[in-house]
Amino acid sequence: MKRTLEFVIDCGQENMDVRTFVRRYLGFSARILTALKYEGEMLKNGEPVHSNAVLKAGDTLTLTLLETGEAYEKADLPFAVLYEDEDFLVLDKPFNMPVHPSPGHDRDSVLNAAAWYSQNTPDFVFRPLYRLDRDTTGALVLAKNKFAANAKLTKTYRAVCEGETPESGCVNVPIGLKPGHKVERCAGIGDEAVTEFQTVKTSGGYSLVDFHLKTGRTHQIRVHMAHLGHPVAGDDLYGGHLDRTEHQMLCCCAVHLLCPALDIDKTVETDFSAEQKACFPELFQ
């Protein structure tokens, strides 16, 4: 999709070059600047300019990117839209839906569903800004253009964990692929992984816990909580029991979007489904 941004330079930005304005003032990455140079357009007062061009108060700087998205097979799979504008689509990812197509899941992914959802929009681009495990529910942000893909995100996860978790804590234990396994991870080997958590409520031998991730390792919350002896309920891969639910009780319950250049500073929230909450009434009353 084509996306054009226009800015009128004020006195506080005078004598900046285009590169400095785009990087420092707008907060865009060097990759965006490169894309504007080779795949897009930079205009000052309607005339093409290089990134070293100096800006004066009253100048109009126009930035345009044109891109086409990868074609995915369309699949009519329902999902709830939590928020949408010209730059972002935030959906409520259902249980048992992978984000990307993969062997065995070539037509039931989020991207297949997004292709169906956007089929009447020419050249629609949808770029997931992070992954959620197939059985993790909650807010998933799709960027509609490269400008949006540069947004800063802050996510909050919520889980039902077995046992009585501490009031708060920080787990700083590396995570890596379990030897001999293709999917399962384990704690104690691999890359640095840091998880902060805060217990919201404890009742009936289970705890409702909020998480903020300082790193983004595969299965990070699941592995770290299993390491502490408090696996996520319903997560039988890492020791969670299925006696109360067959659904993994892990949700991305909030995401904050920040991109001043796109005029967005917004928190989008969701929660476990009513069906999931009904399995743990003592935690959700």
Regions found by a protein language model. Give the residues of each.
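RNA pseudouridine synthases
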Residues: 1-285
